[in-house]
């Protein structure tokens, strides 16, 4: 089957698209990649939150890609799942979710080995409200610095000394093999990842049964369960990719239960609400995600979300 993948043009996005293309190629499909420039890629001089305010849209990295799917220009899209809005438009399906890689956030620094080693008042670069909020909760003295751009751009700014450290997703650095300055991988109980972080989402049109069948082998059931929980919780809280909510679901080491970590934190005050919950393996993922959201709200998350477009 001839397949066309719609992808953003960043180094990481193309790595991900080529990875999926190679897996499809090994199944005998002919695959090409079409680069699509999204709203989030074009508006590089302002924050993600400001981009969302301008567009009135949570899908700042997906809208144009979905347009390519809708008009038949592409058969599938490869997304970083954390960038894909929870309210997927009606014509589209999340046809496959491959096995997740390291979902953790990491500290990257030239000179400092850990978050605790950063000096008083250190400058730390991040474009994420969620990371900024958790950073302020852990180290109120630190100055978060708005930091956009692709991985190479951020690493260059770090090397130039614009900041003392940056916060990134482990998955991107691992995939691009750019871990020279990776100093600390945060456990979810300390620094909770975004919903879907470390996972890819393969999006297709719902009515494209041939493409859905072609990508079905890529789907990983445990990963799909975990990210469904995370995305259900995020949807219940009214959060998009820039609301300061961290949610992570994983199988316990002995695979006997699901472990869930969640946090809602205020980007400026550092106030945070955290939960750690265990659930039976046979749980319903949607119901479990909704339960996590209810637990967060019951422990005081609503006021923290009120100013960020989340649940009231």
Per-region residue spans from a language model:
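Ordered, amphipathic secondary-structure segments that act as subunit-interaction surfaces
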Residues: 71-84, 197, 203-208
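Short active-site oxyanion
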Residues: 2, 73, 119-123
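Small-molecule-sensing regulatory modules
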Residues: 1-45, 52-54, 62, 137-312
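A conserved helix-loop-strand patch within extracytoplasmic ligand-binding domains
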Residues: 81-84, 88-142
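Short, structured active-site "lid" loops
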Residues: 46-76
């Amino acid at each position: 089957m001839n397949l066309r993948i719609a992808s953003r043009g960043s180094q990481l996005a193309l790595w991900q698209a080529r990875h999926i293309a190679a897996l499809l190629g090994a199944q005998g499909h002919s695959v090409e990649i079409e680069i699509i420039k999204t709203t989030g890629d074009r508006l590089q001089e302002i924050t993600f939150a400001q981009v969302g305010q301008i567009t009135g849209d949570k899908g700042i990295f997906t809208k144009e890609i979905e347009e390519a799917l809708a008009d038949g220009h592409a058969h599938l899209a490869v997304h970083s799942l954390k960038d894909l809005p929870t309210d997927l438009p009606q014509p589209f399906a999340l046809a496959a979710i491959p096995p997740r890689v390291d979902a953790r956030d990491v500290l990257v620094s030239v000179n400092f080995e850990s978050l605790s080693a950063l000096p008083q008042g250190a400058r730390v670069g991040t474009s994420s409200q969620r990371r900024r909020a958790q950073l302020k909760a852990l180290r109120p003295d630190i100055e978060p610095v708005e930091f956009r751009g692709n991985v190479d751009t951020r690493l260059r700014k770090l090397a130039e000394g614009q900041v003392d450290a940056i916060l990134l997703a482990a998955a991107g650095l691992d995939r691009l093999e750019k871990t020279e300055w990776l100093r600390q991988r945060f456990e979810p109980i300390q620094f909770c990842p975004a919903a879907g972080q470390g996972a890819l989402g393969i999006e297709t049109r719902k009515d494209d049964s041939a493409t859905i069948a072609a990508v079905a082998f890529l789907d990983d059931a445990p990963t799909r369960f975990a990210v469904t929980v995370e995305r259900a919780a995020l949807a219940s809280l009214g959060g998009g990719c820039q609301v300061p909510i961290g949610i992570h679901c994983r199988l316990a080491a002995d695979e006997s239960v699901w472990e869930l970590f969640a946090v809602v934190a205020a980007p400026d005050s550092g106030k945070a609400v955290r939960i750690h919950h265990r659930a039976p393996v046979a749980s319903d993922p949607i119901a479990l995600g909704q339960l996590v959201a209810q637990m967060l709200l019951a422990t005081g998350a609503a006021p923290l979300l009120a100013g960020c477009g989340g649940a009231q």
